[in-house]
């Protein structure tokens, strides 16, 4: 498996990164992520154009046209799970690693109960707050228009994902 990735460049605080997944050189999947950059000390948003190290590294003709829309949660959600964030869920910065949230979402949706003929074809996660080891997230699920949604709420009632 080969993952090929690049950024699209940006003049605003929002930056897109595109991914191609290849097996034996054949495309088998793709992904898009949207990011904002923030200063480590002051947490102020930065523009990608302020990062001189990244000048000229855009993907050019490889850039995808797909953009991500803001997620609109269903009005009614039901509590499905409470999950304590563990040390093994975190990255070097002490935050829960982004890849772990996809696992939490799939677990909350009970994907193991799907027939083998059905599978997850699209996944969009909106990160709204950082979680750390020891934090507890309540995972709520809901459905709207044939799509399934999962929301993570921290102990203070603030949305995390």
Predicted regions mapped to residue ranges:
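HotDog/MaoC-like acyl-thioester-processing domains
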Residues: 2-73, 128-136, 142-161
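Generic secondary-structure microfeatures
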Residues: 23, 35-39, 87, 100, ...
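Short amphipathic
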Residues: 75-88
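Active-site helix/loop of acyl-thioester processing domains in fatty-acid/polyketide metabolism
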Residues: 97-118
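Short structured motifs
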Residues: 122-127
């Amino acid at each position: 498996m080969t993952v090929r990735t690049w950024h699209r460049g940006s003049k605003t605080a929002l930056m897109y990164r595109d991914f191609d997944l290849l097996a034996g050189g054949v495309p088998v999947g793709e992904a898009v992520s949207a990011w904002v950059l923030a200063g480590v000390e002051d947490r102020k948003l930065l523009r990608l154009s302020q990062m001189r190290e990244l000048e000229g590294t855009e993907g050019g003709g490889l850039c995808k046209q797909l953009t991500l829309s803001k997620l609109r949660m269903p009005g009614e959600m039901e509590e499905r799970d409470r999950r304590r964030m563990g040390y093994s869920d975190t990255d070097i910065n002490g935050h829960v690693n982004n890849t772990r949230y996809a696992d939490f979402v799939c677990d909350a949706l009970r994907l193991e109960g799907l027939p083998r003929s059905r599978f997850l074809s699209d996944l969009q996660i909106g990160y709204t707050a950082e979680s750390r080891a020891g934090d507890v997230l309540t995972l709520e699920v809901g459905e709207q228009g044939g799509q399934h949604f999962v929301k993570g709420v921290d102990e203070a009632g603030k949305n995390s994902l």
